[in-house]
Amino acid sequence: SVTHVGTTAEQAFAMAAGVCQDHTHVFLALLRDKGIAARYVSGYIYEATQAYMASHAWAEVLLAGNWYTFDISNQHFTPNCHVYIAFGRDYADAAPVRGVRTGGGDERLYSQVMVSTSPQYIPQLNAQFAAQQ
């Protein structure tokens, strides 16, 4: 990728390139420029065909007192497939892993996430989301 966690919305927009984090930062910058409340969300997106997945980022926008999902990268606008980890102003607020390490030696971080649905709750979630519309 041509971007990294430190890439700003302005830089990603100028490059016309990036990943979900960059798409979300650009979208948030445009919304905030217009005075629209919005937040950065980090988590995972559930794909029935994939048992393991990478982290993902999307936005939520506050409209008429309700938060609405805007996954610009995947063009998803309902939260049915999103697994929330954290939300905040930007990646720095909602980084899925953050910390400080001191001392010598090598380090490695390995994580694995498995997500599956529970069919009994999907109709309830869909009804709850529809009621908020």
Predicted features along the sequence, with ranges:
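Secondary-structure boundary elements
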Residues: S1-G18, V26, Y91, T102-A130
